[in-house]
Amino acid sequence: MTLFVGLGNPGSKYEDTRHNIGFKVIDSLVDDLGARNISKNAFQGELYRIANTLFLKPTTFMNLSGKSIETVKQFFKIELEDIIVIHDDIDLPFGAVRFKRGGGHGGHNGLRSLDAHIGKEYIRVRIGVGKPEHKSQVADYVLHRFSEEEEKEIERLVKHVSNACKALLCEDLNKVKSYYSLKSIEGLE
């Protein structure tokens, strides 16, 4: 069984923020594939399923998302290598997309929570959201909406990442990485 997790914060206040790009990708996948909602309170998230594939949007806040993922992982007996986490990354320019297995949290509190609850060797789909001018602005930056110019590209970016995630269901990580990685939004056709 494969588990795709989109990181984000619950509630309409955060819906279109940089931090919620992972939720947008999960929404796209669920819509494209027609996955059905199988959520239960115990999962602490919106959980969808189609065949042997699960899609999770934790409804805990970002900093606590590891608990939701751990619960789903244990309930469905999912191996760590079958978990794919989609998240924002301020260390990448807007629109960049990178894939890797394992690694550090890079200051991302959602990943920090995840690492503490399930370990580090899951696949990460990192989506660049750009970086604020000063480190002290990071929290405000990721909790704000994209700029008008960026907003125009979000739908295409989300579709690209969604297609990459679908490819991960049947292709090797390195093959997906070589085809779907982007250095910036300009690389998106």
Curated annotation (Swiss-Prot):
The active site is at 19 (proton acceptor). One of its GO terms (cellular component) is cytoplasm. Its EC number is 3.1.1.29. Signal peptide: none annotated. Gene3D superfamilies: Peptidyl-tRNA hydrolase. Keywords: Cytoplasm, Hydrolase, RNA-binding, tRNA-binding. It catalyses: an N-acyl-L-alpha-aminoacyl-tRNA + H2O = an N-acyl-L-amino acid + a tRNA + H(+). Hydrolyzes ribosome-free peptidyl-tRNAs (with 1 or more amino acids incorporated), which drop off the ribosome during protein synthesis, or as a result of ribosome stalling. Catalyzes the release of premature peptidyl moieties from peptidyl-tRNA molecules trapped in stalled 50S ribosomal subunits, and thus maintains levels of free tRNAs and 50S ribosomes. This is Peptidyl-tRNA hydrolase. The gene is pth.
